[in-house]
Amino acid sequence: QVEADPSVLNLSAFETFYEEKRPFFSEGASFFKNRLNLLNSRRIGASPNYFDPDSGDLENVSDNTTIIGAIKLIGTTNSGINYGFINAMTKEESGDLFIGDNKNRFVVEPQTSYSVGKLEKSILNKFSRVGLMYTDVTRKNSTGANVLGLDWKIGLINNRLFSNGQIVRSNTDESGDAFRFNVGYKNATWWESRFWLGSYDDKFDINDLGYLRRNDMTWSGMMFKIRRLEPIGYLLGSSFEIKLNKKWGIDDILIEDELSIETW
């Protein structure tokens, strides 16, 4: 038995994200997880809603799409390449469409195949790796979608100099692009600094199998922190942090401009 989702009152224009609780999909899910979430397995077996009738009343529709079958492979090759693959097939879902005195069957969700694959390889040292991930949604007699993403995590100088990020392209009716990265340095004793930058264009869409709160957005920011871990008199330690973060939306409209200063 799968734990039910909590009740959420969502008054925003954005979709609510629910955590995966089905063991088949939740076990090993961390391998596919990244900041830009290309796999939201809750799409598989979700409420059927791909097609909406232009008129009439739709009744007798299943609450969830039926999963016909699924397969998952996760492991590591002899050469040290980590791999993961998931494929699931869902059946066509229909309902009764009433228009006046007429009743017809209406396809709400076509038969669909969901696939995701990822390869990951350690490079340079134990702190660094690079990954390549691909997702595909194929709908019977309907438009599908696919996404290709490159991600990395690099750590140098005993992981004091670090960077991570993603570059992603989506293909639905149109192609869209996105990237995000941050780079930073953490001194072993008293300071650290970080810079980040990212952008999703207005055609970027991964929501057939992933989760994206919104597209058409650019952001950048920086953080600088000074810390002292050794006691000074009666003080056990002290820190100072300054952080600047900006986000722009449609037509370069500023949607967030944050400056924060913290001491403790």
Residue ranges and their predicted role:
Residues 56-59, 95, 100-106, 135-138, ...:
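Extracellular loop and loop/strand-boundary signature of outer-membrane beta-barrel proteins
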Residues 66-68, 74, 145, 158, ...:
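Exposed, low-structure sequence patches enriched in small/polar residues
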Residues 2-75, 85:
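Residues that cap or anchor secondary-structure elements
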Residues 45-54, 95-100, 127-134, 157-166, ...:
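Flexible, solvent-exposed coil segments and beta strand-coil junctions
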Residues 8-14, 100-110, 149, 182, ...:
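Flexible, surface-exposed loop regions and adjacent strand-edge segments
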Residues 1, 73, 119, 149-152, ...:
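Conserved structural-core and active-site-/substrate-pathway-adjacent residues in large, well-folded domains
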Residues 114-171, 230, 237-241:
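Surface-exposed extracellular loop regions of Gram-negative outer-membrane beta-barrel proteins
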